Amino acid sequence: MSITAERKQALVAEYANKVGDTGSPEVQIAVLSERISNLTNHFKSHKKDNHSRRGLLKMVSQRRRLLDYLKGVDQNRYQTLIKKLGLRR
């Protein structure tokens, strides 16, 4: 359900604005999206895992808040990020 340290480092390297950037909204959203994707796959076989479902809902809400923040700060960064992650259809 959680992501490996190597995968997290790869996401940080891909979405970071500079070396060592782990706190930017882009990196946080990318890591949350990966965790959300993993949990979504987990629920396909564990439908009654309500404890983890609550964690999933918290992650989705956190990602939504970060996306709203990024949209307010810089519209171009927001657009490139959602295209890169494939969040909007």
UniProtKB/Swiss-Prot annotation:
SMART domains: Ribosomal_S15. The keyword Repeat does not apply. Gene3D superfamilies: 6.10.250.3130, S15/NS1, RNA-binding. Keywords: Ribonucleoprotein, Ribosomal protein, RNA-binding, rRNA-binding. It comes from the Bacteria. GO terms for molecular function: rRNA binding; structural constituent of ribosome. The keyword Ribosomal protein applies. InterPro entries: Ribosomal_uS15, Ribosomal_uS15_bac-type, uS15_NS1_RNA-bd_sf. GO terms for biological process: translation. GO terms for cellular component: cytosolic small ribosomal subunit. SUPFAM superfamilies: S15/NS1 RNA-binding domain. Part of the 30S ribosomal subunit. Forms a bridge to the 50S subunit in the 70S ribosome, contacting the 23S rRNA. Belongs to the universal ribosomal protein uS15 family. One of the primary rRNA binding proteins, it binds directly to 16S rRNA where it helps nucleate assembly of the platform of the 30S subunit by binding and bridging several RNA helices of the 16S rRNA. This is Small ribosomal subunit protein uS15. It comes from Bartonella tribocorum (strain CIP 105476 / IBS 506).
